[in-house]
Amino acid sequence: MIPSYDPNDTEAGLKLLEDLTTNAEAIQQQVLHQILSQNSGTQYLRAFLDGEADKNQQSFKNKVPVVNYDDVKPFIQRIADGESSDIVSAQPITELLTSSGTSAGKPKLMPSTAEELERKTFFYSMLVPIMNKYVDGLDEGKGMYLLFIKPEIKTPSGLMARPVLTSYYKSQHFRNRPFNKYNVYTSPDQTILCQDSKQSMYCQLLCGLVQRSHVLRVGAVFASAFLRAVKFLEDHYKELCADIRTGTVTSWITDSSCRDSVLSILNGPNQELADEIESECAEKSWEGILRRIWPKAKYVEVIVTGSMAQYIPTLEFYSGGLPLVSTMYASSECYFGINLNPLCDPADVSYTLLPNMAYFEFLPVDDKSHEEIHFATHSNTDDDDDALKEDLIVNLVNVEVGQYYEIVITTFTGLYRYRVGDILKVTGFHNKAPQFRFVQRRNVVLSIDTDKTSEEDLLNAVTQAKLNHLQHPSSLLLTEYTSYADTSSIPGHYVLFWELKPRHSNDPPKLDDKTMEDCCSEVEDCLDYVYRRCRNRDKSIGPLEIRVVSLGTFDSLMDFCVSQGSSLNQYKTPRCVKSGGALEILDSRVIGRFFSKRVPQWEPLGLDS
């Protein structure tokens, strides 16, 4: 089920894409047949299929329940603790992928196999012919793609647990990839695989600057990471230019493989190049800086869908009119689809699901609230509601244009009818394969980078801060709160709006700086593993801020929401605001601003059950 072709042959790649999307229904049936043939004897599926490789789609749906992570966590944890892979997979589980989502504050673990890396390599290869279809001459230069690895964790079984991109970059599929004239990087692999993210960033930018005349596209995986690179360049351009001018690498780059690989690219002093770059970077405005430094660049490749859409205005400011290209939709659980119209407006990005990547089903959701249509999952059944309404679950080729769905996957690696949590809207079809716009991650209210903070996570953290710091000795009541992700600066940070009042009067609250700063720190301490990693290790999120607003502010917010069409009877304070008008009301009534003064603790540990 893993096709192959010469990635240097654009026409062959486009033909393969046509074949896959034209035969989507048959391929989906083959995928399910293969998964069940391989894995029907696993402990997990035996409980539902009695060891029979029942390959009929409807029978599979009748017998195997739709599940979420809490349902499958015990099975995956047993593998992490050293039990056999055949709990969920006939193929050996070779690693566990850490999701950006968390369960009980710890990263979710997704099983993966050696074969799955081959499937991902195929997926990446399909991106190249699509770009070649729309952009000429990509074989005449290089891409400055800023790619990074993150910490790994060794589980009791000996299996490594790591983010999906770290898994791919460290694999032989990436490190020993065959030459592809359309996909040559400015960054040596040694700089991508550097454990120190700051050294990695510096070295990759230095290589991209030295090779500026060869750079035809720039980018990173996520918009947030690319903007951190722009900010890093702004902070370090003088040092970078000094290295180019002298043909040396600054002394604080201590990773020897990084130093050696970068020195080979520097290849001696270049006064003229250093002066050109420094002149551009010294300009008062950095508007259009990407086009000015890399004048041959044809586009910026970053994911700008979902929570990354908040970075589009900033990217447009720096890009100088370069198209923003969002090529793919993938997660730790599965690689899903690709953008067949990569030069479209970022707001119009849709992904075409590749039918050979997994078996896909879709749970309809309400198009207004994005709440699930009434049904029961395996872990949440009532006596009167314990039967899954099978007619609501839709196959890949049977989704309807304009409808919203949550994607449900059955993978080759041991996830069966698993709810990913992504809400998608069907925008059309390419041949028989549907195209989806990513709408949102279910239950997520705040996200800056790879963090995903839910309303429940936020409530628990705010409650803890309130109990530990507001009741004594300050005697303040937190009457209401909301939040938003502030990306006006780099890195972005969480902002909480709190309305406080004294317990024993209606006077304006007296705000003690240390108390409020402790509240900021307490909230951060209570947020999950991924948030704390982003703050502590990755430095991709700035210190959390609390803005205290005057009494009555949330009444004004309610009035505004009702004036915009919300029902007064059903109004609930939004726990995250995105409307410009709502933010204006909140910001206009701020009476105090406080930031966390310390970085929350984070250790790459704690995956035990």
UniProtKB/Swiss-Prot annotation:
Enzyme class: ligase
GO cellular component: cytoplasm; nucleus
One annotated GO molecular function: indole-3-acetic acid amido synthetase activity
Top-level taxon of the source organism: Eukaryota
InterPro entries referenced in this protein's UniProt entry, alphabetically: GH3, GH3_C, GH3_M
Biological processes, Gene Ontology terms: response to auxin
Listed Pfam families: GH3, GH3_C, GH3_M
Keywords for this protein: Ligase
EC number of the protein: 6.3.2.-
Record's note on what induces expression: Not induced by auxin.
Family the UniProt entry places it in: Belongs to the IAA-amido conjugating enzyme family.
Job description of the protein: Catalyzes the synthesis of indole-3-acetic acid (IAA)-amino acid conjugates, providing a mechanism for the plant to cope with the presence of excess auxin. Strongly reactive with Glu, Gln, Trp, Asp, Ala, Leu, Phe, Gly, Tyr, Met, Ile and Val. Appears to favor Glu over Asp while the other GH3 favor Asp over Glu. Little or no product formation with His, Ser, Thr, Arg, Lys, or Cys. Also active on pyruvic and butyric acid analogs of IAA, PAA and the synthetic auxin naphthaleneacetic acid (NAA).
The protein's name in its UniProt record: Indole-3-acetic acid-amido synthetase GH3.17
Organism: Arabidopsis thaliana
Gene from which the chain derives: GH3.17
